[in-house]
Amino acid sequence: MGEAFQLLKARHSWTSTEPGIAMTISTSSSARFATRHSAQEDVFALVIATVLVSFGVVLLRQAGVMTGGTAGIALLIHYSFALPFGAVFFALNLPFYYLSLRRMGWLFTLKTFCAVALVSFFSDQHAVFIHIDQLQPFYAAVLGNLILGVGFLILFRHKASLGGVNILALYLQDRYGFKAGWLQMGIDIGVLLASLTFISLPILACSILGAVLLNFIIAQNHRADRYSA
């Protein structure tokens, strides 16, 4: 999910408020003059996006497939200790809101907090309405990440995200000069390698394929030179 967040970062202009850091990311002219979404549109979009993302996570979880980022860490804890994914995902994101507030501002942080809370809630509610007896891992990795990609695109278009280690990577880049993309990749690789303690190599291959597919979807559909919304 690291490349996806990098594309979101490059698309909008955010200025760091960290003392000693003067960092502004340029905004494309098309995005600068785009009509802003209304509050009602943002609320509707966040609900739709989080329903999609949470259902994508349910498919991955049901098939035992992994993903990267904070969601991957939450799945790792879920598989290891049988804790509810929603509660773990919500708790893992809590430390990152302070960095988000400093890095992206209060509106982005508020939307991200709401998105994380909704994904945490919906991911545990889908099981009330849907029971999956059998799910092939390859199919789950492809379909789950397709759905995740659509959900992320909606969140990004409405200037929100699912926070987590993406924000940490961007903060460390601003503060210490580390490359956020490489940091994110390192975290994702670490999560996937840690998952080898309870998943097989074929499942790991499906997980890697799904992660590549997710980033490809966002890279192709969240571009400032093509879309202004």
Segments (PLM) and residue ranges:
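Core subunits and conserved enzymes of cellular information-processing
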Residues: 5-229
